Structures are given as C-alpha cells and as structure tokens.
Amino acid sequence: MKALVVYSSRTGNTRKIAEAIAAVLPGCEIHPVESAPAPEGYDLVAVGYWVDKGMPDAQAKAYLETVRDAKVALFGTLGAWPDSDHARDCIAQGEALVNAPERRNKVLGTYLCQGKVDPKIVAMMQKMASDVHPMTPERKARLEDAAKHPDEADCLRAQEAFKGFAEQVA
C-alpha cells in the first residue's frame, strides 16, 4: 500500500499524531502541508488538521480541496472534548470538505483527539470572554486538561484507528 500522511500543526499536536499514524502505515510518506506532494497516486491519503472555529485550519482545508478520486482518512486535534457535540460537528465539517460529490472521494474515517490550545488563542478567548466564549470554570478546566494532550494513549488510539482505515484499502 502506498500511503500519504499530510498534516498541518500549529503547536505540534497534529504533527505528533501524524507521526504516530505514519509509523503504522506500510509504504507511508509523511509531509507537513506546506511541502506536501499532490495527493494523486496514493492508495490512502491521510490529512491532519487542527480545528479552527469548528473547521480544519486554513492550510489543511486548502489541501483537502485538492484531493480527488481518493480514499481519504482524516485526523485532527482540538481543545474541546473529543466526544463532545462540538467535536462531532468538527468531524462532519472536515468530512464535508472531502465528500463534495464532484471530488469523488471515499472517506474511510476520522480520528479526533484533544490537544493543547495555542496560548495566543487562549489569550484572545479571554479578551473576548464576555462576548462569545466566557472563561467559565468548566472551560478553564477543559483547557488545562487539553494541555496534557495528545498523550501516548491518544497516539495509540490514532494508530489503531488508522490500522482499521488501512484495512479498508488493502
């Protein structure tokens, strides 16, 4: 199997997951999105992103829009709980980018895990706290927990998920 892992990472979270995934995919190339090759000619195209306002970040989104006629698996990191409604919405948004009918892709699955939030984004959220994202005790606790991720367990779960996605290609 010829696999391609492309990732966009702001804090290193998504890169860490990308490296874990690449380690279990035979015949795998791994590239940051800035230097990623065109997605054509691969049996599996895995694209990783950090969640920005409920969507894949701009660089990952631009790359995803180039993927056509491919078997695709997505992965991402976000500050929210990975089993939250927000996370499910983020997964749907990412898959919608790939599933546009004119692109003729097949999404094999998505893996999303929690990751530390860039301190600049946390500071920005605190400035606009009263408007959109108030810094409640729950939000503060979630951000503190997110700072511990991705951890080894997150990497192992990503590897297991992608072994399963790869089996769909073989």
Model-identified regions with their sequence ranges:
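FMN-binding flavodoxin-like domain, especially the glycine-rich phosphate-binding loop
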Residues: 24-31, 44-47, 52-170
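Conserved SAM/SAH-binding loop
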Residues: 33-36
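N-terminal beta1-alpha1 ligand-phosphate binding loop
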Residues: 2-24
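Alpha-helix C-terminal capping/helix-to-coil transition sites in glycosyltransferase folds
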Residues: 40-42
